[in-house]
């Protein structure tokens, strides 16, 4: 068996990726989220596949088909809520994974990091289109509002929006194409994740100290396989608790009302994991400016490696940078809260200040703090 594992062309790839992979001996539980994201993707693809067997992407029957899944299909309610809450778990793991990358300087692996940013965009696009499919009120109006933002693009904006809609409003054509894209994108995400791993294994994993770990490597199996299994068990515990005890905790009650183009909900807002970006979008009074800020709020991740001014890789031994990092985390939580609030005083000004602070921290304050730390260490 050992021989086959190391000689068979397919088994060799698996062996070099998950069994005999040399891994740093000191990577903490913050390194568990990569495997958890893989599990999330598998759960989403499987539950999504079973949902697609019963779902109809037609405006007249989409809402009814989701109701039918929940009421009449064996364990349909379980599959539906695993899929919906699985998306929330996916984003929790994503945010923690990206946060880990920023804290420990993993972004210095440029190829891996850039593919990761691309993956983040792809997953966000997938989640947005998936939210439209149940064809509830928030599905319809969320799709209308977010796609309409593209009309802010000069000259081609209006034509672009109508081209995406497949008509003059969000309708049957829009729903059908969103279903098609929502089905295909996770497989593209899986392929990109493979490339992400390929690039990572070219360099090997980073570790909390940010120092080279070539002198102290251990095999991935059994040490990190057992550690990943513990992470997966905790993940399953949280996901099943969420699904079985409060499946609608993170959803919007408006989505239990069928889509009605003649009736606008009082507060249109996306799912919780987009609220921070939505808050940044709303904090700018100009439409095009808001759209640019929205895109840049994620795209700013791609410039983080260029702004690394510290002589150390990780933040483990940099208290100033640590303080700014946790202020950034608090700021993102503030933006998430603001994104779910109505557009009125004092939420408007809080959102604007939090948006300014977000970009200021990443683009200005953190690079300056790194230079200051270099100076204090006389480097």
From Swiss-Prot:
GO terms for cellular component: mitochondrial inner membrane; respiratory chain complex III. Binds 2 heme b groups non-covalently. Its main location: mitochondrion. One of its GO terms (biological process) is mitochondrial electron transport, ubiquinol to cytochrome c. It is a multi-pass membrane protein. InterPro entries: Cyt_b/b6_C, Cyt_b/b6_C_sf, Cyt_b/b6_N, Cytb/b6-like_sf, Cytochrome_b, Cytochrome_b_C_euk/bac, Cytochrome_b_N_euk/bac, Di-haem_cyt_TM. The keyword Amino-acid biosynthesis does not apply. Heme b b562 binds at residues 83, 182. Heme b b566 binds at residues 97, 196. Keywords: Electron transport, Heme, Iron, Membrane, Metal-binding, Mitochondrion, Mitochondrion inner membrane, Respiratory chain, Transmembrane, Transmembrane helix, Transport, Ubiquinone. Changing residue 6 to T: In strain: Isolate SO-03/2/17-2. GO terms for molecular function: metal ion binding; ubiquinol-cytochrome-c reductase activity. Belongs to the cytochrome b family. Heme 1 (or BL or b562) is low-potential and absorbs at about 562 nm, and heme 2 (or BH or b566) is high-potential and absorbs at about 566 nm. Component of the ubiquinol-cytochrome c reductase complex (complex III or cytochrome b-c1 complex) that is part of the mitochondrial respiratory chain. The b-c1 complex mediates electron transfer from ubiquinol to cytochrome c. Contributes to the generation of a proton gradient across the mitochondrial membrane that is then used for ATP synthesis. This is Cytochrome b. It comes from Sorex saussurei. The gene is MT-CYB.
